[in-house]
Amino acid sequence: MSDYKDTLNLPKTSFSMKGNLANKEPMILNKWEKQGIYKKIREHFAGREKFILHDGPPYANGSIHVGHAVNKILKDIIIKSKTLSGYDAPFTPTWDCHGLPIELQVEKKHGKAGQSISEDDFRKECRKYAKKQVEIQKKDFKRLGVLGDWEQPYLTINFDYEANMIRTLAKIIENGHLSKGFKPVHWCTDCGSALAEAEVEYADKVSPAIDVKFKIKDKDKLAQAFGLDSLNHDAFAIIWTTTPWTLPANQAIAVNNQLNYSLIKIEDFYIILAENLVEQTLKRYAIENAQIIATTTGNKLTGIIAEHPFYSRHVPILHGDHVTDDSGTGLVHTAPTHGVDDFTLGKEHNLSMEIFVKGNGCYSENTKLFAGEFIFKANDRIIELLGEKKRLMNSDKIKHSYPHCWRHKTPLMFRATPQWFISMEKQGLRDKALQAIKETSWAPSWGQARIEGMVKDRPDWCISRQRTWGVPLSLFIHKETEELHPNTIEILYKVAEKIEKDGIEAWFNADDCEFITETAQYKSVKDTLDVWFDSGSSSMCILDLDKRLSYPADLYLEGSDQHRGWFQTSLLVAMSAKGSQPYKEVFTHGFVVDEHGRKMSKSLGNVTSPQDIYNTLGADILRLWTASTDYKSEMAVSDQILKRTADTYRRLRNTARFLLSNLDGFNPVTDIIEFDKLVKLDQWAIAKTKEFQDKIIEAYDKYQTHTVAQLIHHFCSIEMGSFYLDIIKDRQYTAKTDGHPRKSAQTAIYHIVHALVRWMAPILSFTADEIWDATLKTTDLPIQLCEWYTGLKSFDQDAELDLEYWAKIQEIRSEVNRVLEIKRNEDVIKASLEAEITIYADKYNYKLLEKLGNELRFLLISSKADLKVIEESTSSSIAANIPGLLIEITKIEEPKCERCWHRSSTVGDNPQYKDICSRCVENITTEAGESREFA
């Protein structure tokens, strides 16, 4: 037996089978750094049409989690796909660097500002801490393969950014949107500060639910309201509340003029309830012998005076539009300093706005009975006191959704304080913002309705904070009237100039006289700006000012929580400062959860960290998982899910390796064969690749990364792995090295590789770089500077063997493979090359298959394939799952060729080569080798 190994075209490539990504990726990153790859991209695409994806700043505190990784990877994929489409698509990373979380970290080490450490030194430590956190996160983002201007990121602590925030505020004031107000705002006792809507999250809380009796002072007036002559017992207005701690601040009871109210006798007293709530309320009280005495409307009750349940204070009954008879009692306890509706009613009727609760959540010294107590702890004492005073009608517990601080996870209170607001109504900001939302493209589409609802119902934006680490509000107000200084705009621009030079410290360390001359009449405001104003100003501070970028951004892409956060604050800042929306399109992705749909939590032990993933599996696995997951909803990740992703990656890598290894000896300059002269199957491969490329580019353009990932996987596994590459192995390995059949396949492979590596590049950035290095090419450009491959061709419209034809051939081949598997399981054959395949076809299928002539066997990977009319079928033939087709498999008895392993009667025909077939002899001995037309 001769050794024919040297006569075969065995595959050869430098591209390894094993990814070994965790070790290789840092080396590739190092190469990119040395090449200055991001700078080269910017230079290469300078002057092209721009595409701007504006980065929403992550908070500079702690290592990145998998949600951060998903967000940056998705952005990177989109940027890279836009670059492939020929856009100048810069990516400038940003970071949010002011605010309470950083203050808290610095406090742990240095103590509170103004106590253990000076405020100036405290700010320096905050700045130092933020910069350190940025470097930690930056290293992780770069390790993920995210390309961007990492050397010049935008930090909200950059002096120019801080200054431009002040200039943005000046524009907002100039446009008439700023207002000062004494209003109830969400207040965190742990933060010691007001919170913006975006900083409030809702969680279940168990609260006391009590019904309180307010004794009616003038029974005769009440009797008259119900059309009665008199009342012979005391009467009580009943309110229901889940915040007993607000009762010291009660100033009124609200009813609705349009609702009906009932007077009910219970033993020796009367109570007032909304008519529609009588039955369920009495049931809640477990009272069965009550008697409804009379009914009246709410407008008859207004003006009647009640008595506070434990203070010597008169409480009027007033009309309130917010009062309903859906729940409670239909009479609403009103504490103007602790609720928005309460405050509105209080302003309307000039009720007392006395402050009973301090910023730390304790009652002030002027709060009788409870001075100094923490409000939530005082609930039990208040309930006890109501019982002693015989003013407690009912006491229960309720589990309900309650506002909590997003940082401390502790319950919030509504507290009226003097604050600065961006008014939603003053200059029609709400209506303008709602119109801008309509003019923006939202994906998923429900995002539009979500943000519309939020903007429609949101209160004025409280932008002032009582914190140390933040951009100063930089305002001066009159010491008596508290009106803004008449030269506020000029002063703000002056402040901005100083901050641009020395940072926010230039304000905090300056005397008022450095900015104004009228220090006897005016004083500076010590508040800082809401940290959401920092990030919300990014479109004004970055897009509108950086000539490398453009306003508005083409795309904002963040998590779905940003409808109430950055999407909304960006919109409000831009609309109030510039009068136009900051974005053309807004995309949201879901949160990352575990495989059971649970939120990531250390206590559950289900946290998947990006660092663990890239240090074990590699960043490309994390990138592939991110791209493969439909990010419009929750994104599930776990070790098992990542293992499946790694399996998918191996299939893609093996496909690339097979393609590359079969280009050995191919010269793309001299060996390329024109499309019309290729073997028909190779024409199909190129046309099919073109079809997939069109779909992939369309999916990238729609930011449908999961569709891209599915298409690439299907292309590699089905179109290539299960069909094309499986068929051409014989031709690649056994045909004459420089013969037409092999060069034809290599031409197709060359085109496929150049298309495939570009499809992969946005997602599998490290692997694509590795493939590119191993690819034959006629350019010195790195893959990051390439555009979509243009060397593919489609079939002409009149092509006989077009994509539709080959799709039918694939169906038939799948059926043949199914029957081959049956015969393998029956031990009739061990491999398909041992099979003699006979296909019995009706007229339609016969016509399809006969076009392939004697090359049908190569498509079926068998040694012999016969085509016969269906009428000749035998009892041993098996019906295909295609109408008009029967398949018969028998074991071929002819000898095996030791070179190509086909069974052939021609083995031994040539006395010089006794153990190989005539086809192999032809490939070894003749100048041209065998010829192929179809497969």
From Swiss-Prot:
Q: Where is this motif: 'HIGH' region?
A: 58-68
User: Which cofactor(s) are needed, names only?
Assistant: Zn(2+)
Matching entries from SUPFAM superfamilies are given as: Anticodon-binding domain of a subclass of class I aminoacyl-tRNA synthetases, Nucleotidylyl transferase, ValRS/IleRS/LeuRS editing domain
Locus of motif 'KMSKS' region: 599-603
Q: What is known of its domains?
A: IleRS has two distinct active sites: one for aminoacylation and one for editing. The misactivated valine is translocated from the active site to the editing site, which sterically excludes the correctly activated isoleucine. The single editing site contains two valyl binding pockets, one specific for each substrate (Val-AMP or Val-tRNA(Ile)).
Q: Name the Gene Ontology molecular function terms of this record.
A: aminoacyl-tRNA deacylase activity; ATP binding; isoleucine-tRNA ligase activity; tRNA binding; zinc ion binding
Its biological function? Catalyzes the attachment of isoleucine to tRNA(Ile). As IleRS can inadvertently accommodate and process structurally similar amino acids such as valine, to avoid such errors it has two additional distinct tRNA(Ile)-dependent editing activities. One activity is designated as 'pretransfer' editing and involves the hydrolysis of activated Val-AMP. The other activity is designated 'posttransfer' editing and involves deacylation of mischarged Val-tRNA(Ile).
Which family is it part of?
Belongs to the class-I aminoacyl-tRNA synthetase family. IleS type 1 subfamily.
**Main localization (coarse):** cytoplasm
GO cellular component: a single term = cytosol
Q: Kindly state what the record says about how the cofactor is bound.
A: Binds 1 zinc ion per subunit.
Name the catalysed reactions: tRNA(Ile) + L-isoleucine + ATP = L-isoleucyl-tRNA(Ile) + AMP + diphosphate
Summarize subunit and interaction data from the UniProt record for this chain: Monomer.
Q: Which EC class is the enzyme in?
A: ligase
Q: What does the UniProt keyword field contain? A: Aminoacyl-tRNA synthetase, ATP-binding, Cytoplasm, Ligase, Metal-binding, Nucleotide-binding, Protein biosynthesis, Zinc
List where in the cell it is found.
Cytoplasm
Q: What is its EC number?
A: 6.1.1.5
* Chain sites annotated for binding Zn(2+): C897, C900, C917, C920
Protein name per its UniProtKB record: Isoleucine--tRNA ligase
**Signal sequence, renumbered to the chain:** none
Task: Report residues binding ATP.
Answer: K602
Against InterPro entries, the record matches this protein to: aa-tRNA-synth_I_CS (IPR001412), aa-tRNA-synth_Ia (IPR002300), Anticodon_Ile_BEm (IPR033708), Ile-tRNA-ligase (IPR002301), Ile-tRNA-ligase_type1 (IPR023585), Ile-tRNA_ligase (IPR050081), M/V/L/I-tRNA-synth_anticd-bd (IPR013155), Rossmann-like_a/b/a_fold (IPR014729)
> Which GO biological process entries does UniProt record here?
isoleucyl-tRNA aminoacylation
Q: Which residues of this UniProt protein bind L-isoleucyl-5'-AMP?
A: E558
Q: Which species does this protein come from?
A: Francisella tularensis subsp. mediasiatica (strain FSC147)
